[in-house]
């Protein structure tokens, strides 16, 4: 990925899960909930559903050449994304897993004084809101773009074009930050947006240093 064109950036669009926080235990819980949903849907055992989903993800990834999302896997197996996210809302409890990180709070507050900040997530709005509140980041993002806005899961060119339109940012002005290149960053980069891959909190915290090179001091 190219170096960030600092002087052009006028807004930042963050992924949520795995980007603004990293919690393997909660990620595992999301996966387990999806397995339970598919097991109930198909009338099979948990272990069978888990293996079926793993095989399906591997097949889809091989045929497409890109890593496939949980939404894509469940849809391929006959699941309904609306029902899947309803199941998530009813069964997931992020408050039991996600810990607040004061370093991230300071970073996001600092960036919000210099850029409009937004969230673009494959999570649903109620769950995303609960996670943002748990992280202590409520009120710092101008807009939250979630999967239940139009039920177009990332990566999706139509959804991305709509986000750029709604934020009033040109591709060159919109920095996308995410932990999965194929899911969060590949399409924005194809649009001409600067992107930043962040898979750890330490990588996320480097944003302040990297963006200090833009025209206005950060």
Model-derived features: where do they sit?
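Asp-based, Mg2+/Mn2+-dependent phosphohydrolase catalytic module
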Residues: 1-12, 82, 105-109, 115-218
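N-terminal helical cap/lid subdomain that shapes the substrate entry/recognition surface
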Residues: 2-102
